[in-house]
Every structure is written in C-alpha cells, then in structure tokens.
C-alpha cells in the first residue's frame, strides 16, 4: 500500500530526479573550483558561487524534503536523524564553500588556503579502505576523532 502511494504520487521518481540533479552539479564542482582558482578566473568562480552552488542547494533541499516524506510514509521516524545530519552537512558545506569563494572575490581574504594546497591522490599503495569510512574522510584533520 505504501509503495503504491509513493509511486502514484511520483515521490520516488521526484526523489531520483533531484538526486540526479544534485550529483550532476556536485560531480566535478571541486575540480572546477580549483581549476578556476588556479587560473585566476574570477568570473567562473562568481558564476559557481552565485548560481551553481545555490542551484545545487535548492535541488538538495527539495531532495531532502521529498526523502523525508518518503521515509515518514514508508517507515517509522526512528533513524531519519541520520539523513538529517548527512544531508544537512552537505547543504552547510556547500553554503560554506560559496561564502569562502565570495570572501575571496570581495577581497575579504586575499587567497583561499584550501585551494593552494597540492591535491592528495585518491588511491595510493599504502592506502587503507578509507573511502568507505565516512568518519575518516570527512576531513583531513584528525580532530574529528575527538568529536
């Protein structure tokens, strides 16, 4: 009954439509920001911070709203707080990224330290399976182990 309701109302399809839009927007966002920064292409950075990031956030917030409706229709509320934290964290991180770019473009900061650093390779011979450990890839800083 619940699955029929969700399909009939298009919620499942709407969710995946928004998910696809979010992933399409985020897939190479960091690479493009780094490239534009390295090339000092401030117009591209402005386009990203003022248009692309807000569009991704809008799609993500709508996706989150739809996902919550699906969850509450299909399951008990217990456990949804984990999706709140994860999706809310992505939204907050995108907002912070936009603010950092805007601060740079407005001259509030002269450089973006996080974009000056050499990128670490994703795979190395000594690497453990960190890509499957959210708690270990959320930051390059070890302070998150104390939270």
Regions found by a protein language model. Name each.
Residues 1-147:
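Catalytic domains of carbohydrate-active enzymes that cleave complex glycans
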């Amino acid at each position: 009954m619940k699955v029929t309701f969700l399909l009939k109302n298009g919620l499942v399809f709407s969710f995946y439509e928004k998910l696809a839009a979010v992933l399409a927007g985020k897939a190479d966002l960091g690479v493009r920001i780094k490239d534009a920064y390295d090339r000092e292409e401030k117009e591209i950075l402005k386009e990203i911070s003022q248009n692309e990031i807000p569009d991704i956030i809008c799609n993500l917030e709508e996706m989150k709203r739809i996902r919550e409706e699906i969850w509450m229709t299909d399951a008990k509320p217990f456990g949804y707080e984990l999706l709140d934290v994860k999706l809310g964290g992505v939204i907050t991180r995108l907002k912070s990224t936009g603010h950092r770019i805007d601060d740079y473009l407005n001259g509030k900061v002269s450089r973006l330290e996080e974009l000056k650093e050499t990128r670490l390779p994703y795979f190395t011979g000594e690497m453990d399976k960190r890509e499957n450990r959210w708690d270990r890839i959320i930051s390059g800083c070890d302070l998150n182990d104390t939270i």
